[in-house]
Swiss-Prot record:
Protein name in the entry: Synaptotagmin-7
Binding site for Ca(2+) 4: 297, 303, 357, 359, 365
Effect of residue 172 to N: Loss of Ca(2+)-binding in the first C2 domain
Topological domains, Cytoplasmic: 38-403
Location of the C2 domain: 135-255, 266-399
Assembly and oligomerization: Homodimer. Can also form heterodimers with SYT6, SYT9 and SYT10. Interacts with calmodulin (CALM1, CALM2 or CALM3). Interacts with CD63; required for localization to lysosomes. Interacts with APP.
Keywords: Calcium, Calmodulin-binding, Cell membrane, Cell projection, Cytoplasmic vesicle, Exocytosis, Lipoprotein, Lysosome, Membrane, Metal-binding, Palmitate, Peroxisome, Phosphoprotein, Repeat, Synapse, Transmembrane, Transmembrane helix
Length: 403
């Protein structure tokens, strides 16, 4: 009897069955790889979306006093920079820094519905803020309109009592000028290095700007601390609806700076304690817990951990860090770190505490920072002084995280 050589024995798998099994196995492998790749892309894009950035030109610190910058606003409405400042280097995309976009965006939504009556030098519009808010300094500027030339003039003169944003106890302030709701076009002053009471005396012209459109705008000034190697830190902001200002002549204002719209409150808070032991020449920093941390991942959460840097005379001395708390916006750490600090070096010592969001597949994100020293912000200075006044006792305090 003839037997088909292709026929399989009853217990053995046929060629077709083996082929189908191989195809299924390969398909499952490809599917798993694609799912993993999609998850990685989704997480990475999610972080970028949460921290969407706009490109900004670097302020030129070499410009002279009293110089004018002009933006020509044609009837079509788009602003074009037509008058470069002498000595200013051209903007180069490769030499631009990034800044949070949310401050200006949030302000457009909140201010267009709140047109408050203002008078030059008046500060009554800020009374509702309460006297307990942090002092961010104040700024002096002038604004007026030339009807013959259809030009709005803004002069930024000076600022006083700005807070220190650098761990060296100073700031490098400059000012951005917007006419909201236009967020795309802006003008900037030069940077004043290491100066908490800067004088700019710079004049800015918005040319070809019909008066009926000017009164629909909000003059917005944002003071920032320039950082050459990272994002600039917002110091404070001021806004004035131009339909509430007499623009027939130059009006001069002194206005207190308010927290920027993307301010520190949205980043969360950190509870920590400091314990100073003068006989042992040491400070113990206890990172206790955080609350309401900013969500950095697309899933609406973060993987926070805390870095603690000991600085002496602007130089890094020692770093410690906590464990990472997965998917937690209200983590509890309870981790202590001891630092050796001789008494005679206390005055030049700064402790920088940074809350980070851990990311395995990309660079870790900064959620917020705290600078502790005798020359930091009011809340930080109070904690530092309380620590020294109560030796060998842990002194705990909540701190707002800052950009």
């Amino acid at each position: 009897m003839y037997r088909d050589p292709e026929a399989a024995s009853p217990g053995a798998p046929t060629r077709d069955v083996l082929l189908v099994s191989a195809i299924i196995t390969v398909s499952l492998s490809v599917t798993i790889v694609l799912c993993g790749l999609c998850h990685w892309c989704q997480r990475k894009l999610g972080k970028r979306y949460k921290n969407s950035l706009e490109t900004v030109g670097t302020p030129d610190s070499g410009r002279g006093r009293g110089e004018k910058k002009a933006i020509k606003l044609p009837a079509g409405g788009k602003a074009v920079n037509t008058a470069p400042v002498p000595g200013q280097t051209p903007h180069d995309e490769s030499d631009r820094r990034t800044e949070p976009r949310s401050s200006v965006s949030d302000l457009v939504n909140s201010l267009t519905s709140e047109m408050l009556m203002l008078s030059p030098g008046s500060e009554e519009d800020e009374a509702h803020e309460g006297c307990s808010r942090e002092n961010l300094g104040r700024i002096q500027f002038s604004v007026g309109y030339n009807f013959q030339e259809s030009t709005l003039t803004v002069k930024v003169m000076k600022a006083q009592e700005l807070p220190a944003k650098d761990f060296s106890g100073t700031s490098d302030p400059f000012v951005k000028i917007y006419l909201l709701p236009d967020k795309k076009h802006k003008l900037e002053t030069k940077v004043k290095r290491k100066n908490l009471n800067p004088h700019w005396n710079e004049t800015f012209l918005f040319e070809g700007f019909p008066y009926e459109k000017v009164v629909q705008r909000i003059l917005y000034l944002q003071v920032l601390d320039y950082d050459r190697f990272s994002r600039n830190d917002p110091i404070g902001e001021v806004s004035i609806p131009l339909n509430k200002v007499d623009l027939t002549q130059m009006q001069t204002f002194w206005k207190d700076l308010k927290p920027c719209s993307d301010g520190s409150g949205s980043r969360g808070e950190l509870l920590l304690s400091l314990c100073y032991n003068p006989s042992a020449n040491s400070i113990i920093v206890n990172i206790i817990k955080a609350r309401n941390l900013k969500a950095m991942d697309i899933g609406g959460t973060s993987d926070p951990y805390v870095k603690v840097w000991l600085m002496y005379k602007d130089k890094r001395v020692e770093k410690k860090k906590t464990v990472t708390k997965k998917r937690n916006l209200n983590p509890i750490f309870n981790e202590s770190f001891a630092f050796d600090i001789p008494t005679e070096k206390l005055r030049e010592t700064t402790i920088i505490i940074t809350v980070m969001d851990k990311d395995k597949l990309s660079r870790n994100d900064v959620i917020g920072k705290i600078y502790l020293s005798w020359k930091s912000g009011p809340g930080e200075v109070k904690h530092w002084k309380d620590m020294i006044a109560r030796p060998r006792q842990p002194v705990a305090q909540w701190h707002q995280l800052k950009a």
